[in-house]
Amino acid sequence: MKMKYIYRRWLFLMAGALLVANFASCNDNDENSPILPPTYSVDRSNMFGIHEQPKVGENIGGQSDNGVTPQLVADMCGALGVKSFRMLLHLSWVFDHDAEGNLIFKEDNLQKFKDYAALLTEKGVRNIMLTNAAYMYPYGCTRSHWKAVPEPGTELYIKFMQQIEDSYKMLAAAFPDVTQFEVGNELNAPKGHNLCKDGFRDGATAEENAPFIFTTSEQALVTADICYYANRGVKAANPKAKVVAPGLYMVDIPETKAYLSAIYDHIVSVSYTHLRAHETDQYL
């Protein structure tokens, strides 16, 4: 306790000394001194656009501000000189099933996103990454929540993963100029925030949802499988495109390191055989 007190007092004194030194350096002669801008440089080729999802179509984006449109976002990117851009495009926004259960595009929605990408390209964006966080569920099957994933190792789980492969094959073919596909978002988030088992429900208590929360190891397993199958689909349509691992949830979550280690272990482990052959370059 005494050491903490001394440390806090030392910080306070140092901050005070810096303030005094700063004020002491100002005198009457400084009034006519030129105010110079800070010296820094910006490599615009490294600028990366990320934004509030604009209102692309009915029930797509604009949740926070209906005034944010694709044109406005593109104009701002052009003004800033942004060259790379992360575009949110959930698979559920552009895919559906026909009466026979085949995966098909929602053509109107797909065209809206193509137009959005064209606006960005017109304003100078050269690298577009499509980001998804809402996967389609196999035809004829229901689930308790849009973010629910079937239990690993089940037949439904295999169908789910194969549909991810089919989805990304179609998506990569529909966007031949897209260079990167981020195949999930914060799948390691706690409490089933972005990934859960069927049975998880909004409004349920933590105790009621507890059986439907993936462990860190299970989150890593599902993430590795998603990357594997999405990569197969993307590469089938566009061998030059890249699959990007889902962005990490890193707020007050010490399990992040274990999650990343488990993904690596799942990829390189020779005992990881519940799906297909797993060469490490077939993931990302």
Residue ranges of model-derived segments:
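Boundary/entry segment of secreted carbohydrate-active catalytic domains
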Residues: 34-83, 88
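Substrate-binding cleft and catalytic face of glycoside hydrolase catalytic domains
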Residues: 80-99, 111-254
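Distinct, well-ordered alpha-helical segments
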Residues: 252-271
